[in-house]
Amino acid sequence: MKVHKEGTGLLLTLFTILFIVNITLYHTVGKGMLFYSVAFVSTVLFLLVLNFFRSPFRRFPYDSEGLVIAPADGTIVAIEEVMENEILHKKCLQISIFMSIFNVHANWFPVNGTVKHVSHQNGRFMAAYLPKSSTENERSAVVITTRNGVDVLARQIAGAMARRIVTYAKPGEKCHVDEQMGFIKFGSRVDVYLPVGTEVLIEMDQKVTGNQTPIARLSK
């Protein structure tokens, strides 16, 4: 499995620091319980961070036309009608996916279309599974207009541990399912806002896989 480009710098830095710490400890105290304990913790820490930045190759295996595909790995924590007052300014169906630190944290475009809007807003860093995180945490918004003229809003939300949201989408560019929309580092959430009345294909607490699980079907 590949390492995501967002993690290469951090992993190299972490490896260098851990290597120096362990070599210094070895030459200072030699082999012993302290050295082996630190070496074990260092290995586990590096493997955990490496696992977080894994970048699996994924292709949606079916015709994606009219479908909304999960933009992230995680658990469905919200399926509800809400007023979206920041970007779309209308009532929408919100589907929210919470990503734990053990999930892949790459984000994919949920639909095919043209990027209409991209924005970033600073905010708090409360736990991403809380409903208020959608409007109070640091977040980035991407609006995609489908071929049929439907606006779909995908919002990347930072969590309690996530301090950096990366968004690759650019206004005016064509986007497709199978392409990465961005990346969120360390525990986070993605909300998708759809027209009211959209057919929902998932249920609460369901585990979904980014760019693999259909979560809704847009009306024709």
Curated annotation (Swiss-Prot):
Transmembrane segments: none annotated. Signal peptide: none annotated. It catalyses: a 1,2-diacyl-sn-glycero-3-phospho-L-serine + H(+) = a 1,2-diacyl-sn-glycero-3-phosphoethanolamine + CO2. It is a peripheral membrane protein. Is synthesized initially as an inactive proenzyme. Formation of the active enzyme involves a self-maturation process in which the active site pyruvoyl group is generated from an internal serine residue via an autocatalytic post-translational modification. Two non-identical subunits are generated from the proenzyme in this reaction, and the pyruvate is formed at the N-terminus of the alpha chain, which is derived from the carboxyl end of the proenzyme. It holds the Pfam family PS_Dcarbxylase. It is found in: Cell membrane. Its cofactor is pyruvate. Binds 1 pyruvoyl group covalently per subunit. GO terms for biological process: phosphatidylethanolamine biosynthetic process. The active site is at residue 188. Keywords: Cell membrane, Decarboxylase, Lipid biosynthesis, Lipid metabolism, Lyase, Membrane, Phospholipid biosynthesis, Phospholipid metabolism, Pyruvate, Zymogen. Its EC number is 4.1.1.65. InterPro entries: PS_Dcarbxylase, PSD-A. Pathway: Phospholipid metabolism; phosphatidylethanolamine biosynthesis; phosphatidylethanolamine from CDP-diacylglycerol: step 2/2. The modification Pyruvic acid (Ser) is found at residue 188. It is an enzyme of class 4 (lyase). GO terms for cellular component: plasma membrane. One of its GO terms (molecular function) is phosphatidylserine decarboxylase activity. The record marks 187-188 as: Cleavage (non-hydrolytic). Belongs to the phosphatidylserine decarboxylase family. PSD-A subfamily. Heterodimer of a large membrane-associated beta subunit and a small pyruvoyl-containing alpha subunit. This is Phosphatidylserine decarboxylase proenzyme. It comes from Parabacteroides distasonis (strain ATCC 8503 / DSM 20701 / CIP 104284 / JCM 5825 / NCTC 11152).
